[in-house]
């Protein structure tokens, strides 16, 4: 799957990112949101996580360029302008770096 340059912040392919502010909905979908270059980098480096997609501005894309070839055929990698993040997500994501990944199964033993 090639990188997808998003020119319209209302693009339907970004639907998952529109609801990241609704914690209960995100939890019910079984995903979590990673924000920021360091956190997303660690997520991409850790084989235990099933990453669904990335939403990056150009700067974040360049900062993660060394890792993206491993993921380019596996997940959608969306790029858009930093100014579009508030339109897409409802938040001023000034870092321009988000990932959606599968929430790990909760280990009930570790909760006790």
Predicted regions mapped to residue ranges:
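Short glycine-rich anion-binding loops that position phosphate/pyrophosphate groups of nucleotides
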Residues: 59-60, 84, 104
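Conserved small/polar residues in nucleotide/adenosyl-binding loops
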Residues: 110-112
């Amino acid at each position: 799957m090639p990188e997808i340059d998003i020119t319209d912040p209302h693009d339907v392919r970004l639907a998952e990112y529109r609801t990241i502010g609704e914690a209960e909905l995100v939890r019910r979908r079984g995903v979590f949101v990673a924000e920021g270059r360091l956190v997303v980098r660690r997520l991409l480096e850790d084989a235990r996580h099933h990453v669904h997609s990335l939403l990056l501005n150009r700067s974040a894309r360049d900062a993660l360029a060394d890792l993206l070839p491993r993921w380019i055929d596996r997940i959608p990698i969306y790029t858009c302008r930093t100014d579009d993040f508030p339109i897409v997500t409802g938040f001023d994501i000034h870092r321009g770096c988000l990932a959606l990944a599968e929430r790990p199964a909760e280990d009930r033993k570790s909760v006790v």
